[in-house]
Amino acid sequence: MIPLAFGVGSALTALVGRAVGAGDWHTARRTAWVGAFLALLIAGTAGAAVGLAPMQFASLFSGDAEVVAIAARALSWVGPAFGGFGLGMALYFASMGAGRMRWPVAAGLCRIALAAGGGWVLANVFGMGLDGHFLGVALGITAYGVVTALGVRQGEWPGR
């Protein structure tokens, strides 16, 4: 997912930065959202495919039945969250162009906290085992997209 989101995001850094430099915050936000929805669509489509056929995708990377089974479990949980990653990554780069990095950094911290801490709680406290860790990662990825998106709105990108 990183190459896809990076391709969109790196262009957003320049496009948003140019609009911000011209003092056109409306265009900066609009450009950020168009790019973010493009990344969401691309990553979400890939994630849906992975989530719907996890065994087939896992089999591309290993012939070991146990490895494929565990990888397929992970992909079935995490695949549907790929769209959130695309959204978050694209808006991260757009925020960099706007010079507004507080929300994307907070989003990254939320992602880590949910993936590691939330995954541990789900796995151990709620007894979900390995699936709890995978769900924690999916929740972290989703939160990354949502929290980053919260930072790209008029109240946060109003101008200087």
PLM region spans:
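Short loop-to-helix capping motifs
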Residues: 64, 100-101, 129
